[in-house]
Amino acid sequence: MKVAEEYDKGVPMMLAPQMGAIDATVESIRYRAQLIARNQKLDSGVAATGMIGFAAGFLFSLLMVIVLPLLFW
């Protein structure tokens, strides 16, 4: 009795799947997820420091508009 290797036959190979469209979709999803994560981090940072930045800007504007002209007049 001969085995399959002796006849140079084995289990037939399946066709390789077409992965181009799937890979492109995965990359698109990954890119969008990274954009969303970056945007959330930016929004969180702005929200966390918004009041401090507003206060610093307000004090700087008072210094430039009120205090400096009084010193130089």
UniProtKB/Swiss-Prot annotation:
UniProt-listed Enzyme Commission number(s): 7.2.1.4
Annotated GO MF terms: tetrahydromethanopterin S-methyltransferase activity
Membrane topology: Single-pass membrane protein
EC supergroup of this enzyme: translocase
Pfam families registered for this protein in UniProt: MtrF (PF09472)
Compartments reported by the entry: Cell membrane
Location, primary (coarse class): membrane
Keywords assigned: Cell membrane, Membrane, Methanogenesis, Methyltransferase, One-carbon metabolism, Transferase, Translocase, Transmembrane, Transmembrane helix
InterPro entries recorded: MeTrfase_F, MeTrfase_F_su
Pathway assigned to this chain's UniProt record: One-carbon metabolism; methanogenesis from CO(2); methyl-coenzyme M from 5,10-methylene-5,6,7,8-tetrahydromethanopterin: step 2/2
TM regions (residue ranges): 52-72
Annotated Gene Ontology cellular component terms: plasma membrane
GO terms under biological process: methanogenesis, from carbon dioxide; methylation; one-carbon metabolic process
Record's catalysed reaction(s): 5-methyl-5,6,7,8-tetrahydromethanopterin + coenzyme M + 2 Na(+)(in) = 5,6,7,8-tetrahydromethanopterin + methyl-coenzyme M + 2 Na(+)(out)
Superkingdom of the organism of origin: Archaea
Function: Part of a complex that catalyzes the formation of methyl-coenzyme M and tetrahydromethanopterin from coenzyme M and methyl-tetrahydromethanopterin. This is an energy-conserving, sodium-ion translocating step.
Subunit structure: The complex is composed of 8 subunits; MtrA, MtrB, MtrC, MtrD, MtrE, MtrF, MtrG and MtrH.
Family: Belongs to the MtrF family.
Descriptive protein name: Tetrahydromethanopterin S-methyltransferase subunit F
UniProt organism field: Methanosarcina barkeri (strain Fusaro / DSM 804)
Source species taxonomy: Archaea, Methanobacteriati, Methanobacteriota, Stenosarchaea group, Methanomicrobia
